[in-house]
Amino acid sequence: MANLTGNVYIDGLWLPGHGAPFESVQPVTGETVWDGNAASLEDVDAAVREARKAFLAWRRKSLAERQAVIEAFGELLEANKEELAHQIGLETGKPLWESRTEVAAMMGKIPISVKAYNERTGHTESDVAGGHAVLRHRPHGVVAVFGPYNFPGHLPNGHIVPALLAGNTVVFKPSELTPGVAELTVRLWEKAGLPDGVINLVQGGSDTGKCLARHSLIDGLFFTGSSTVGHLLHEQFGGQPEKILALEMGGNNPLIVQNVSDLDGAVHHALQSAFLSAGQRCTCARRLLVPKGKKGDEFLARLVEVAARITVAEFDADPQPFMGSVISAEAANQLLKAQAAMLEKGATSLLEMKQLKPDTGLLSPGIVDATGIELEDQEFFGPLLTVYRYKGFDEALELANNTRYGLSAGILSDDRKLYNRLVEEVRAGIVNWNRPLTGASSAAPFGGVGASGNHRPSAYYAADYCAWPMASLEAGKSELPDSLAPGLNFD
């Protein structure tokens, strides 16, 4: 594959952006790993207009033709998986072992998307009185895809693949923190034979994103990212019911512990839930609900003991660490400030989160006991876990639902009845039992309620927001019915 150029990609051409210069920086070494210019207003306009021009020809291709190009992209992912995994680790700081799983998820998304398209948005016919009922699905047109930095390959891919399969054209605006991953990915789409204009790449920060979101010629926007930005987009799209908006945002996710016989098994799942990807998964456990008393004390003691031994290092360290860095030194500093603010309000540190190397994104895991403390209902996107102690399961459920978010929730318990109550009473789109909260299947819907989304779940249900249904009643010719409505006379 070609070296990174720092260009935007519009109508099959790699061109310099005309906006402000910017760069992405390796979060530990400070090395510049990508530099270029943001897409200007004119660049964004050109990208949208070229996507509009390419739409009719792309949607008119058969499903098999579109699928063939997408599967060619999957083959190129396989052939270039190490290079892409390295770029993901380089820009995000996540360890290579985890970056490789991200590329594997990108490849796995393709057959799942094909299956979902056929099952949820395919073509069906049935006989009805006087003819046939036919259900078809049609693409929206030009859709904007906004990608996040935590999974810069997999998460935008989860929008792009089903959107293209359905016949849409795409303008992709990745996170300004991971532009290199986006450029490599779009180069693979180009190499796969995707026609010019079907996918376009506009790099840049909030100015570029605002230009794209407000463009009059987009038919929809698919977003994965922070609740703050998602709510701004929702406000901006108010009064535009003709445009589809799919928002997948974060959560202040609760994980309940109660009646566990395998202490280390439960501790393992709690650590995976809180600290996988350095806590930078939207489904990560942010609040750990532990019973008061001896059993809860034993669980917390073991949790802190094992968490203190978690290895943290650079993405390409050998041996590989469990955790890499967070996305930037700035993000690390914000997390440290959040920890300090909790302690100032009276919370107790069980395991102090520390910056392991000055001016880097390397943070050790942090665990804070905030029982009885009023804290802001906020998602802290990093390795910072807040513990709340409870007396009975009713209180645990009340604490679990004490959030405006509703993305994920779970319980670690041998008692199936407690899980049944959680499923019945919790408000969350993903609810797990004796599994980490960070485990989610692409063969199931992925999304939340409340401030975590707008009822447009992604993953297997992404097919739903990538196409709209057209229902038809059909007959071969017009015939006079056997019986007429009252008041009609053809004699």
UniProtKB/Swiss-Prot annotation:
One of its GO terms (molecular function) is succinylglutamate-semialdehyde dehydrogenase activity. GO terms for biological process: arginine catabolic process to glutamate; arginine catabolic process to succinate. The keyword Hydrolase does not apply. NAD(+) binds at G225, S226, S227, T228, V229, G230. Pathway: Amino-acid degradation; L-arginine degradation via AST pathway; L-glutamate and succinate from L-arginine: step 4/5. InterPro entries: Ald_DH/histidinol_DH, Ald_DH_C, Ald_DH_CS_CYS, Ald_DH_CS_GLU, Ald_DH_N, Aldehyde_DH_dom, SuccinylGlu_semiald_DH_AstD. It catalyses: N-succinyl-L-glutamate 5-semialdehyde + NAD(+) + H2O = N-succinyl-L-glutamate + NADH + 2 H(+). Signal peptide: none annotated. Its EC number is 1.2.1.71. This is N-succinylglutamate 5-semialdehyde dehydrogenase. The gene is astD. It comes from the Bacteria. Pfam families: Aldedh. CDD domains: ALDH_SGSD_AstD (cd07095). Gene3D superfamilies: Aldehyde Dehydrogenase, Chain A, domain 1 (3.40.605.10), Aldehyde Dehydrogenase, Chain A, domain 2 (3.40.309.10). The active site is at E248, C282. HAMAP family: Aldedh_AstD. Belongs to the aldehyde dehydrogenase family. AstD subfamily. Catalyzes the NAD-dependent reduction of succinylglutamate semialdehyde into succinylglutamate. The lineage of its organism: Bacteria, Pseudomonadati, Pseudomonadota, Gammaproteobacteria, Pseudomonadales. Keywords: Arginine metabolism, NAD, Oxidoreductase.
